[in-house]
Structures are given as C-alpha cells and as structure tokens.
Curated annotation (Swiss-Prot):
The gene is Bicdl1. InterPro entries: Spindly/BICDR_Dynein_Adapter. Highly expressed during early embryonic development. Predominantly expressed in kidney, undifferentiated neural tissue and developing eye. Residues 121-379, 443-528 form a coiled coil. GO terms for cellular component: centrosome; cytoplasm. This is BICD family-like cargo adapter 1. Residues 69-79 have a biased composition (Basic and acidic residues).
Length: 577
C-alpha cells in the first residue's frame, strides 16, 4: 500500500504526460520530500484554473482527513499482529513497545501519500479534459476558417458582378457623350450657316446702296440736262419773241410742265410725311428691340448666377472628395502600421476602429446627401426654365422627404434619373434656343422693311433738296442697321452664354457621377479593410484562449523553462492557419 502511494506521489510531481507518468516510481528517500497536504496542493496548482482546482482538492482533503480520524482507533490492533516474523521457528520475544510519536508520524506520512496519489489522479483527469477541450477548439477553428473562405469566395463573386455593371454604365455614358458632341457639332454648323446668311445679307445691302448711289448720280445728271434744256428753251423763246404763236405754244407747254412739277412736288411731300411716320414706327420697333435685349441680358445674368452656384457646389464636392481621399490615405497608413506591429490588437484599438468606421459611414452619408442635392439642383433648373412654380414646390417637397430619410442607400439617386434630368435640361435649353429663333425672323422682317424704306427714299431723292434728304435717309438707315447689328450681336452672345452654361452644367454633372463612382469603390475598399481587420481580431481572440489552455507545466520536475516560447509558437501556428 505504501509503495503504491509512493508511485502515485511520484506521478503527481512529474510532468503531466499520460504515457510516461504511469511507469515512474519514486526512490526510497522520496517519502521525505512530501511534507503536508498544503505543500502538495501548492506544488500541483494548475495555471489554467487554480481557484477551482484548489477548492476541490481542499474539499477532498477535508473528507479524507475526517475519514482517517474515524478509522484511527481500529488501526492499532491491526498493526500489532504484523510485527511478528513469519516462519516455523520458535516464537520470538515481543518487540519493545514503539514510540507513539513515531507511529503518528508514519500514519501522517501514509495519509499524505494517499492524498498525493489522489491529487495525481485528479491532475491526470484534468489533463485529459484539457486535451479534449483543445481538440474541440481546434475543430471549431477549422470550421470557422472554412466558413470565412466561403464568405471570401462570395464577396469576390459579387465584386466581379459589380465590376461588369460599372463597365456597362461607363459604356452608356460614353455613348451619351458622343451623342452630345454630335449635337454640338450640328449646332455649330447651324451657327456657321447663320453667319454666312448674315454676311450675304450685308453684301446685298452694300450692293443695293451702291446701286442707289449710281441711280442718284444719274438722276442729278438728268436734272442738269433738263436745266440746260430749259435754258436753251428760254434762249429760243427770246430769239423767237417775234413769233406769237410759237410763244403761246411754248407758254402752254411750260404751264403744263409747271403743273406736272407741282403735282410731283405735292406727291413728294406726301411721301416725305409718310417716310417720317415710318421712321417714327421704326424708332418704336428699335425701342422694343432694346427692351428685348435688356430682357435677354437679365436672363443671361440669371443663367450666370446659376452657373456660379453650380461651380461653387462642384468646388465643395471636390473639397469633400479630397478630404475623403486624405482620410483613406490615413487609414491605409494606420493599416500598414498595424500590420507591421507585433503585438495583438487591444480592446481600446478595436473601439477606435469601430468609431472610425462610424465616422466614415457618416461621411459617406454626407456625400450621398451632396449627390442628392446636386440632383435636386438639376431638377430645380429644369423647373425654373419651364417657369412652373408647381414643379418647383414638388421638387422642394421631394427634397424635404428625402432629407428625412438620410439613412437611405446610395441607389436613391441612380444614374438613370440623373441622365433623364440631364436630358430634360437639354430639351429645355433647346426649346429656349428655338424660342429665340423667332426674334431672328423678326429681325429679317425688319430688314425687309428697311429695304422698302430705302426704296421709298429713292423716290424722294428727286425733291428740291435731294442731298439733305438723302443724307438724312442714309443716317437713319445706318442707325437702323447699327441697332439691328447690336441686337444680333446680343442675341449671339446670349446663345453662346447658354451653350457655355449647358456645357459647364454637363461637366459638373459628369464630375458628380465620377465622384459617386469613386465613393462606391472607396466604400467597397473600406468594407474589405474592415472585414480583414475583424478577421484578424477574431483570429487573435481565438488564439488567446488556446495559448492560455496550452500546457505549461512541463518544467516542474525538469527545471524552470520560460512559457513565452510556447505562446509564441502557438501564435505563429494560428498565423500560418
């Protein structure tokens, strides 16, 4: 019994190895090394769960001590019969009475040996339980790794699908840009044709003016010839004063000519008054054209203000994009620093990462709101160009409803709706250009009226003072032509301003679309980075209890070996996995 107890005590003091612990025996002097139950409990305390194991062992020791105390009165008669030596010889004399202190010491040592054996058995069972737990945790770890691999494959497949969708959208946008370029070329061709017509009309007017000057010179030459003929007739009348009949005939002819000239004079005066009235009407039309020019200038100023506002919004979006790009660079630098660090992520760093993720989510929502505001601005421009107040109120109500749902997804403003709004804006601008074309026709009508006025002034050139009237008519015509040219110039400027505003608005919308695409790509990158960080922290959290459960009691009987090497090997094993 004592030898078996010594063997169990030796197993308790050896390392916790199930294969080699059963065949180890203590030498003869090993019984002196075991002193008391408290010393044995201190030697075999296990770091994995020292409190629970010590409490259980103390309870078992208390039960064993109570049982031994109850069995002590019957042990003295059993010990005494074992003292005689077995054999066939004569009975020996009784041995001398043993010392009771020595017996109590021996019994105490036997009790300690029994307790040590039971402690060794309990430690062996504990070691087996820990090995089973280790196998179960290893199995759970492999299952989780397989699940993470499946999720990784699913995320890769989604990324490929999204990449195909974005390529399709890019191709659609390229076709839209090509169509817009074709339309711009057509508009430029129309403008060139209008310029050619204008130059042709100016050339025709200059040619007509030259012909009018030639006709005036011929009329003056005819007038000179007529005056010379009158002088010749007067001389003839003086020469033939003697002949009364000829004188009477000549007198009658002269009276007829005077009457004809007086009638012609009255007709010219009537035409002059009509010309003055038409000049007044032309001045009224010029004033109306000036009013229209002022209206067009005000509209161009409004368009400039809208363009300036859109440029400011574009600058704000660019500034926010630069800020987000800087934050992404900061996150990548922090990620590189975290990957180069050898220590594991603490709870404080995880909290900071979660707070940074929340801040990034808030910034992403802000950028979505900015994209929605740009979309509302495009719709507001469309409604303003239509001049429909009800549409403006509808846009304001839609914007208020969408601002109430700020946590909506990025698909609240799809690329299709922006494209339709852009097409609406293009149609409105085209309709405005078409509305300006009647003014061009009106100017052409006024040009024909000026031509008619020139024809009427040609008739008035035969009056008594043809040079003054001709100069006045030429001055009026030049003023009318200058006003017409100024109006045409203002109209061309308005057209150019509208075209530049349209192109700048298209560029701003295209830049906002590019920013939204970059935002979605950045969101995907951030999701991947956060998933990778969560996976690393999860693996590290799983490696910590495994490292704590790894047996570190190998150096109790062989020497004090550092336990950090085992922990490092275990961390390297999980990193390889």
């Amino acid at each position: 019994m004592s030898a078996f107890c010594l063997g169990l005590a030796g197993r308790a003091s050896a390392p916790a190895e199930p294969d080699s612990a059963c065949c180890m025996e203590l030498p003869a002097g090993a019984g002196d090394a075991v002193r008391s139950p408290a010393t044995a409990a201190a030697l075999v305390s296990f770091p994995g769960g020292p409190g629970e194991l010590e409490l259980a062992l103390e309870e078992e020791l208390a039960l064993l001590a109570a049982g031994e105390r109850s069995s002590e009165p019957g042990e003295h008669p059993q010990a005494e019969p074992e003292s005689p030596v077995e054999g066939h010889g004569p009975p020996l004399p009784p041995p001398p009475t043993q010392d009771p202190e020595l017996l109590s010491v021996i019994r105490q040592k036997e009790k300690d040996l029994v307790l040590a054996a039971r402690l060794g058995k309990a430690l062996l069972e504990r070691n087996q339980d820990m090995s089973r737990q280790y196998e179960q945790m290893h199995k759970e770890l492999t299952d989780k790794l397989e699940h993470l691999e499946q999720e990784k494959h699913e995320l890769r497949r989604r990324f490929e699908n999204r990449e195909g969708e974005w390529e399709g959208r890019v191709s659609e946008l390229e076709t839209d840009v090509k169509q817009l370029q074709d339309e711009l070329e057509r508009q430029q061709l129309h403008l060139r044709e209008a310029d050619r017509e204008k130059t042709r009309a100016v050339q025709e007017l200059s040619e007509q003016n030259q012909r009018l000057l030639d006709q005036l010179s011929r009329a003056s030459e005819v007038e000179r010839q007529l005056s010379m003929q009158v002088h010749a007739l007067k001389e003839d009348f003086r020469e033939k004063n003697s002949s009364t009949n000829q004188h009477i005939i000549r007198l009658e002819s002269l009276q007829a000519e005077i009457k004809m000239l007086s009638d012609r004079k009255r007709e010219l005066e009537h035409r002059l008054s009509a010309t003055l009235e038409e000049n007044d009407l032309l001045q009224g039309t010029v004033e109306e054209l000036q009013d229209r020019v002022l209206i067009l200038e005000r509209q161009g100023h409004d368009k400039d203000l809208q363009l300036h506002q859109s440029q400011l919004e574009l600058q704000e979006v660019r500034l926010s994009y630069r800020q987000l790009q800087g934050k992404v660079e900061e996150l990548t630098e922090e990620r590189s620093l975290q990957s180069s660090a050898a220590t594991s992520t603490s709870l404080l760093s995880e909290i900071e990462q979660s707070m940074e993720a929340e801040e990034l989510e808030q910034e992403r929502e802000q950028l979505r709101l900015q994209l929605w505001e740009a979309y509302c601005q495009v719709r507001y421009l469309c409604s303003h160009l239509r001049g429909n107040d009800s549409a403006d109120s509808a846009v304001s109500t839609d914007s208020s409803m969408d601002e109430s749902s700020e946590t909506s997804s990025a698909k609240d403003v799809p690329a299709g709706s922006l494209r339709t709004a852009l097409n609406d804006l293009k149609r409105l601008i085209q309709s405005i250009v078409d509305g300006v074309e009647p003014t061009v026709t009106l100017l052409s009508v006024e040009m024909t009226a000026l031509k008619e006025e020139r024809d009427r002034l040609r008739v008035t050139s035969e009056d008594k003072e043809p040079k003054e009237q001709l100069q006045k008519a030429i001055r009026d015509r030049d003023e009318a032509i200058a006003k017409k040219n100024a109006v045409e110039l203002e109209l061309a400027k308005c057209k150019m301003d509208m075209m530049s505003l349209n192109s700048q608005l298209l560029d701003a919308i295209q830049q906002k679309l590019n920013l939204s695409q970059q935002l979605e790509a950045w969101q995907d990158d951030m999701h991947r980075v956060i998933d990778r960080q969560l996976m690393d922290t999860h693996l590290k959290e799983q490696s910590r209890p495994a490292a704590a459960a790894f047996p570190r009691g190998h150096g109790v009987g062989r020497g004090q070996e550092p336990s950090t090497a085992d922990g490092k090997r275990l961390f390297s094993f999980f990193r390889k996995i």
